[in-house]
C-alpha cells in the first residue's frame, strides 16, 4: 500500500513525505516507482521524474523498467539539479538513486520539507553486498521504506542480492541478466566461494 493517498488535492496544505523503494536488481523497484507515479498523475497531481544521466541501458531519457514499461523523465548529472528543476510540483520521482551523489539525501529532505512527495527507487546494496551510494541515508530519513525482492535464479527463494557474473571490481557497472543475477543469501555465498580443487597426493 502506498504511504500516502495520492488523490489528496482537497487538502489545502501540502504534506511532504519521502518514500524509498529498495532491493536487488530485477526485484521490481522501477515497476513499483512507475505504478505510484502513474497513480499520482491519475489524481491530477503534477509529477516530475528524474534519473541519473549514466543510466542509458534502455533509453537516454525515459525511465524504463525491466518489463519495458516506460515513463518520460529528465536525466540529471547531480542531485542539486533536481532541486532546480522541481519547482511547483506535487510529486518528485527519482529512479536509480544509488548512482547519485550523497547530496541527494539533503535534496530529498528539502523537497519534503517544502511539501513535495518524494518517491525514490534504488539498489540498497552493490554486488559485494555493501551499502550503495546515498541509499542508506535515504532509508534513514524516509517516512516509509519498501523492500522488494527478486526471485533467486538458482533455487527460487526470495533474492536480496545482486551477484555479478562478469569480472570487474568497479562498483558501478551497468548490466542485465547476462552480467548480474538475483540470488538468495545461501546461493550468493555458494556462487561467491572459490571453486574447490581436489588435492592430488602423489604415491611412491
UniProtKB/Swiss-Prot annotation:
<keyword id="KW-0547">Nucleotide-binding</keyword>
<feature type="binding site">
    <location>
        <begin position="95"/>
        <end position="98"/>
    </location>
    <ligand>
        <name>ATP</name>
    </ligand>
</feature>
<feature type="binding site">
    <location>
        <position position="187"/>
    </location>
    <ligand>
        <name>Zn(2+)</name>
    </ligand>
</feature>
<dbReference type="GO" id="GO:0046104">
    <property type="term" value="P:thymidine metabolic process"/>
</dbReference>
<comment type="subunit">
    <text>Homotetramer.</text>
</comment>
<feature type="binding site">
    <location>
        <begin position="23"/>
        <end position="30"/>
    </location>
    <ligand>
        <name>ATP</name>
    </ligand>
</feature>
<feature type="binding site">
    <location>
        <position position="155"/>
    </location>
    <ligand>
        <name>Zn(2+)</name>
    </ligand>
</feature>
<dbReference type="GO" id="GO:0008270">
    <property type="term" value="F:zinc ion binding"/>
</dbReference>
<keyword id="KW-0862">Zinc</keyword>
<keyword id="KW-0808">Transferase</keyword>
<dbReference type="GO" id="GO:0005524">
    <property type="term" value="F:ATP binding"/>
</dbReference>
<feature type="binding site">
    <location>
        <position position="152"/>
    </location>
    <ligand>
        <name>Zn(2+)</name>
    </ligand>
</feature>
<dbReference type="Pfam" id="PF00265">
    <property type="entry name" value="TK"/>
</dbReference>
<dbReference type="GO" id="GO:0005829">
    <property type="term" value="C:cytosol"/>
</dbReference>
<keyword id="KW-0418">Kinase</keyword>
<comment type="similarity">
    <text>Belongs to the thymidine kinase family.</text>
</comment>
<dbReference type="InterPro" id="IPR001267">
    <property type="entry name" value="Thymidine_kinase"/>
</dbReference>
<dbReference type="InterPro" id="IPR027417">
    <property type="entry name" value="P-loop_NTPase"/>
</dbReference>
<keyword id="KW-0237">DNA synthesis</keyword>
<feature type="binding site">
    <location>
        <position position="184"/>
    </location>
    <ligand>
        <name>Zn(2+)</name>
    </ligand>
</feature>
<dbReference type="GO" id="GO:0071897">
    <property type="term" value="P:DNA biosynthetic process"/>
</dbReference>
<keyword id="KW-0067">ATP-binding</keyword>
<feature type="active site" description="Proton acceptor">
    <location>
        <position position="96"/>
    </location>
</feature>
<dbReference type="GO" id="GO:0004797">
    <property type="term" value="F:thymidine kinase activity"/>
</dbReference>
<protein>
    <recommendedName>
        <fullName>Thymidine kinase</fullName>
        <ecNumber>2.7.1.21</ecNumber>
    </recommendedName>
</protein>
<keyword id="KW-0963">Cytoplasm</keyword>
<keyword id="KW-0479">Metal-binding</keyword>
Amino acid at each position: 500500500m502506498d504511504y500516502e493517498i495520492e488523490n489528496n488535492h482537497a487538502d489545502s496544505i501540502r504534506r511532504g513525505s519521502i518514500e524509498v523503494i529498495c532491493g536487488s536488481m530485477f526485484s521490481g523497484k522501477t515497476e513499483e516507482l512507475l505504478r505510484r507515479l502513474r497513480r499520482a498523475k491519475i489524481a491530477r497531481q503534477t509529477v516530475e521524474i528524474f534519473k541519473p544521466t549514466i543510466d542509458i541501458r534502455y533509453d537516454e531519457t525515459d525511465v524504463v523498467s525491466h518489463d519495458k514499461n516506460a515513463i518520460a523523465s529528465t536525466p540529471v548529472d547531480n542531485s542539486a539539479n533536481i532541486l532546480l528543476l522541481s519547482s511547483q510540483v506535487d510529486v518528485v520521482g527519482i529512479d536509480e538513486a544509488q548512482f547519485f551523489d550523497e547530496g541527494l539525501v539533503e535534496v530529498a529532505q528539502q523537497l519534503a520539507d517544502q511539501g513535495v512527495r518524494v518517491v525514490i527507487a534504488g539498489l540498497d546494496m552493490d554486488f559485494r553486498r555493501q551499502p550503495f551510494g546515498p541509499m542508506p541515508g535515504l532509508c534513514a530519513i524516509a517516512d516509509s521504506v519498501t523492500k522488494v525482492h527478486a526471485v533467486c535464479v538458482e533455487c527460487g527463494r526470495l533474492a536480496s542480492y545482486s551477484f555479478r557474473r562478469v569480472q570487474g571490481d568497479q562498483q558501478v557497472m551497468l548490466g542485465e541478466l547476462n552480467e548480474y543475477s538475483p540470488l538468495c543469501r545461501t546461493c550468493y555465498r555458494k556462487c561467491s566461494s572459490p571453486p574447490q580443487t581436489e588435492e592430488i597426493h602423489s604415491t611412491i
